[in-house]
Curated annotation (Swiss-Prot):
Source organism of this protein record: Syntrophobacter fumaroxidans (strain DSM 10017 / MPOB)
Reported function: This protein binds to 23S rRNA in the presence of protein L20.
Subunit structure: Part of the 50S ribosomal subunit. Contacts protein L20.
Gene that this sequence comes from: rplU
BP terms from Gene Ontology: translation
SUPFAM superfamilies for this protein: L21p-like
Similarity section: Belongs to the bacterial ribosomal protein bL21 family.
Protein name (Swiss-Prot/TrEMBL): Large ribosomal subunit protein bL21
Length: 106
C-alpha cells in the first residue's frame, strides 16, 4: 500500500511506517497531522488516480522532528571586477512518520 501526496509544492511517495521530510508544517513534535492532498493511491491490487487530487483519501501521521537541512552556499562573482558575493541558506523541514493511509467517509 502506498500513496503519492503533494506537500509544499513537491510530491512524495509514502508508505505506512515511513518517515518523510516535507516542507515546514506548523505544529510541535508529537502532534498529529493529516495530509489530504493525495494524488495517487494503491492498495496493492487497485490504483486510484486523482484529477488532480483524491477527495476521499488522506494520509495521517505524526511529527517526529522540526529541523533545518544542511547549508547550501550561493556564490556569485564577476571576473576581473573585484565583485564577490557569498550567501548561505538552510531550508526548514518537518519530518513526519506516516501512520496510516485512510479512506474518508463515503
Amino acid at each position: 500500500m502506498y500513496a503519492v501526496l503533494k506537500s509544499g509544492g513537491r510530491q512524495y511517495e509514502v508508505r505506512p511506517g515511513q518517515v518523510v521530510k516535507v516542507e515546514k508544517l506548523l505544529g510541535e513534535v508529537g502532534d498529529k497531522v493529516t495530509l489530504d492532498q493525495v494524488l495517487l493511491f494503491s492498495d496493492g491490487t487497485d490504483i486510484q488516480v486523482g484529477q488532480p487530487v483524491l477527495a476521499n483519501i488522506a494520509v495521517q501521521g505524526q511529527i517526529v522532528e522540526q529541523g533545518r537541512h544542511r547549508k547550501i552556499v550561493i556564490f556569485k562573482h564577476k571576473r576581473r571586477k573585484d565583485y564577490r558575493k557569498k550567501q548561505g541558506h538552510r531550508q526548514h523541514y518537518t519530518a513526519v512518520r506516516v501512520e496510516e493511509i485512510v479512506t474518508l467517509g463515503q
